Amino acid sequence: MQQKTKLFLQALKYSIPHLGKCMQKQHLNHYNFADHYYNRIKLKKYHLTKCLQNKPKISELARNIPSRSFSCKDLQPVKQENEKPLPENMDAFEKVRTKLETQPQEEYEIINVEVKHGGFVYYQEGCCLVRSKDEEADNDNYEVLFNLEELKLDQPFIDCIRVAPDEKYVAAKIRTEDSEASTCVIIKLSDQPVMEASFPNVSSFEWVKDEEDEDVLFYTFQRNLRCHDVYRATFGDNKRNERFYTEKDPSYFVFLYLTKDSRFLTINIMNKTTSEVWLIDGLSPWDPPVLIQKRIHGVLYYVEHRDDELYILTNVGEPTEFKLMRTAADTPAIMNWDLFFTMKRNTKVIDLDMFKDHCVLFLKHSNLLYVNVIGLADDSVRSLKLPPWACGFIMDTNSDPKNCPFQLCSPIRSPKYYTYKFAEGKLFEETGHEDPITKTSRVLRLEAKSKDGKLVPMTVFHKTDSEDLQKKPLLIHVYGAYGMDLKMNFRPERRVLVDDGWILAYCHVRGGGELGLQWHADGRLTKKLNGLADLEACIKTLHGQGFSQPSLTTLTAFSAGGVLAGALCNCNPELLRAVTLEAPFLDVLNTMMDTTLPLTLEELEEWGNPSSDEKHKNYIKRYCPYQNIKPQHYPSVHITAYENDERVPLKGIVSYTEKLKEAISEHAKDTGEGYQAPNIILDIQPGGNHVIEDSHKKITAQIKFLYEELGLDSTSVFEDLKKYLKF
């Protein structure tokens, strides 16, 4: 469930545009742009309404992964020379896919944006914005506030909801799955709700109330995937809409965040490594904003508020990892910050939640999850180690000062609810049916020694009763960019694979964020090759410890994860049998040299500036997948790209695919008759964008590819898919 209490850290650090949803939905540590950072989400059964027949939006919990961003036109389909023909008869995969696509949509669980405010719950029902009494939120007794079809968009869905403090207005951001463009509608609440106004291309937005009891909406405007302008608007008899702030540095973006107690609205001006925050008084929004601390290169900070004190999560000072500091709200400058709490070394701060008497930190340390509960009255700290099966948090809305609810999940286990009760000082877990996967599978935390001696964590899943793991298929997952954790949310198809005997391995290589800020720093710019060395070490370690073998090893990556995946295919193709890539970033050099692209300047801190720095240019040439394709044997590759993806270089994907096929053809000629060429498939999906949900068609196509390339029997896996995907 969502309301104005938001994911604190994710709303800020992980709203960076490269995540795939700047100022729109999000993916979390770096999550989906479905405002998974910007709003709190709960699983809710979606009820179709009679008023509209458009299918509702299905979204994934942690989809927001950093990404390149582009527009691409005049795309020509790629001739799939090496693609194996499908059998004439419809096989098990096709039957499953067909059944999934024709199944009534309401049979599936939907991630639905909800906001609880006052005595009401606001949410999307079918294609309508509705509200119902809190106690009636799970039945069909609701009031329709706005029909999304009035906007005449194709399959619209609500991305974010904000309710004005006195519930005179509600603002909703509406998008379609084919575009990242959004429309923010303002609905005046009355006996007959009406749309008061609408604004295009809104990213983040928040309500405050001024001294005259008038509702004021602050919002950011997105142009060419960048958010540089902040506006404020009023409605009713005193309508006004004015630009309030413009960020002139193109390498920064702007994001709004309302502190949990609604006392301050923060204007967050950020890039990948540096931030600056201004405070707007929630009681006097027309007063000039107050600067907390002018931007200092390399210093990140995020702000919460409680009882006239600011709590600042920052990397300032040594060590350069996040620490919690505190200062009086009327003396916010950095020289007044006092150290309040420090993290252990190699600890990742996933989120922070502020309560009346407690501050709760959600952490990852040594590849395990923890919750630290800090008593603000006595500075006491209670550290709770969470179950070892858990790999990810899903934050829940919380307006109750006595409880802190959240969910835990893993790639093969559906989310489970937990609640920390402050009065008892204990963590309570949801009771009921125990997931059988806990008894039929194992989760292992392993480490691989990289080329320079650095230990790289891995998370491995396999069936408990599996015998001779060396003969089992292995699916490697990698990302390693932007300081983002490898996505480990629940995926039904991953569970099906484990049930069918697969080994899943998640390699937390440098460049990601699993071990904190330094882990990211050691895998960006002129240290990108560390991530590649880590990935190679992980795969070799798994093989050496008896997990699968190269002929049964596959690799999957999304977006910027395609850099390491593509680089490995160039330098060590013998480690892999098949690779699946989704919206992959494959041409780093040409992309970063094109400063006309909307986000290139914001990406310089991650990849470097090859246009002005010869050192960066030469270094990128060493690992860039496109630049290093050569005539040799490659694993089979399945690439999924999206026709309307604004954030990934689609032309670059096409060029990469053609160049790869040419290299394979040249190698085949040199090798001679009898050479078995790998299967190279480019699947360009119509519509969609970089943050579109996983479709059943895509899932079945990718699994089909893996099974066929490894020569495995797919009969049982599709029966299980039918069960887990609910038809």
From Swiss-Prot:
Q: Which residues form a coiled coil?
A: none
The GO molecular function terms of this record are:
peptidase activity; serine-type endopeptidase activity
Query: What InterPro entries does this protein map onto?
Result: AB_hydrolase_fold, Pept_S9A_N, Peptidase_S9_cat, Peptidase_S9A, Serine_Peptidase_S9A
User: What does the record give as EC number?
Assistant: 3.4.21.-
| Keywords assigned | Cytoplasm, Cytoskeleton, Golgi apparatus, Hydrolase, Nucleus, Protease, Serine protease
Single GO cellular component term = nucleus
Please tell me where this protein is predominantly located.
cytoplasm
GO process terms (BP): Golgi to plasma membrane protein transport; proteolysis; retrograde transport, endosome to Golgi
Is Magnesium included in the keywords of this UniProt record?
A: no
The superkingdom listed in its UniProt entry is Eukaryota
Q: Has keyword Protein transport?
A: no
Active-site residues, record numbering mapped to chain: S559, D645, H690
Give compartment(s): Cytoplasm, Cytosol; Golgi apparatus, trans-Golgi network; Cytoplasm, Cytoskeleton; Golgi apparatus
What is its quaternary makeup?
Homodimer. Interacts with the AP-1 complex.
Task performed by this protein: Serine peptidase whose precise substrate specificity remains unclear. Does not cleave peptides after a arginine or lysine residue. Regulates trans-Golgi network morphology and sorting by regulating the membrane binding of the AP-1 complex. May play a role in the regulation of synaptic vesicle exocytosis.
What does the sequence similarity comment in the record state about its family?
A: Belongs to the peptidase S9A family.
Q: Mind telling me what this protein is named?
A: Prolyl endopeptidase-like
Species per Swiss-Prot/TrEMBL record = Macaca fascicularis
